[in-house]
């Protein structure tokens, strides 16, 4: 099996890059996709998921694949369906699809439509539905921490079972390389429920800086997203899913990470200490 060629979509992101690293460590041949400029000697190939350009070449001679829709697209089905259809056409040995926690709440959502298409494809598959990522605080939400020492979000006091993207990647890599849990979907979470005040306190402890959480209006975040160049449709999507978070829909933890990896998931304290330099 270790001679199989595994294709990783989104290979330059937090999750995809870690999936690539783990697969290489296990002896698999890997190929990653990116929309960015590719350096010489890289194991990456260029794919434009919006147009479909490069998908056929990327999947050439591939045995297994990890599929995801990158940030920036609110109609994830239009991104994922061509990938699922190509995987089906090539009869891949295993496909792992990442959507999000709650994607199966309605059959009409773009993510759920993609899940159903994969479930009905006849392929061996797994679906991974992670809760919100801890790494959002050192990427998407980091500007307020740098400029004001504040996490600025319309999240209320809702608790969240945040998960570390390193655990998400480890689960994906494990499922890609085994058929033990074939044709199952897994909601995956971190080990604890925390609110954004608790996250701010953990970042403060890790950095020695005073970081606080300040609730803002959804309209304020929406304006900030638009001014930073986020497409209107995707900004609306972000506000909508944060609304679900605020209502408590992400207050979920379970034992699926430990069930699959045979170890406990990474908690808030380790995350904050490992990424402290991002907030200095």
Placement of each model-derived feature along the sequence:
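Active-site regions of enzymes building and remodeling cell-envelope glycoconjugates
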Residues: 40-50
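A hydrophobic C-terminal alpha-helical subdomain
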Residues: 11-12, 32, 219-280
């Amino acid at each position: 099996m270790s001679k199989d060629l595994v294709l990783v979509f989104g290979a330059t992101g937090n999750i995809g890059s870690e999936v690539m690293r783990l697969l290489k460590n296990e002896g698999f041949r890997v190929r990653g996709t990116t929309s960015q400029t590719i350096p010489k000697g890289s194991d990456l190939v260029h794919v434009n998921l919006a147009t479909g350009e490069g998908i056929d070449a990327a999947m050439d001679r591939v045995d297994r694949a990890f599929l995801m829709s990158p940030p920036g697209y609110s109609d994830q089905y239009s991104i994922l369906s061509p990938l699922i259809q190509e995987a089906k056409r090539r009869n891949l040995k295993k496909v792992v699809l990442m959507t999000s926690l709650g994607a199966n709440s309605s059959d009409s959502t773009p993510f759920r439509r993609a899940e159903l298409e994969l479930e009905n494809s006849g392929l061996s598959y797994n679906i991974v539905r992670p809760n919100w990522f801890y790494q959002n605080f050192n990427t998407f939400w980091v500007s307020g921490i740098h400029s004001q020492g504040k996490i600025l979000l319309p999240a209320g006091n809702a608790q969240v079972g945040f998960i570390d993207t390193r655990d998400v990647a480890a689960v994906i890599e494990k499922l890609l390389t085994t058929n033990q849990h074939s044709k199952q979907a897994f909601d995956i979470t971190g080990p604890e429920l925390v609110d954004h005040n608790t996250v701010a306190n953990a970042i403060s402890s890790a950095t020695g800086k005073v970081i606080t959480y300040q609730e803002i209006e959804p309209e304020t975040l929406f304006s900030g997203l638009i001014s930073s160049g986020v497409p209107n449709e995707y900004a609306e999507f972000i506000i909508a899913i944060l609304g679900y978070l605020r209502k408590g829909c992400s207050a979920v933890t379970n034992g699926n990470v430990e069930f699959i990896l045979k170890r406990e998931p990474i908690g808030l304290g380790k995350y904050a200490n490992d990424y402290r330099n991002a907030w200095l």
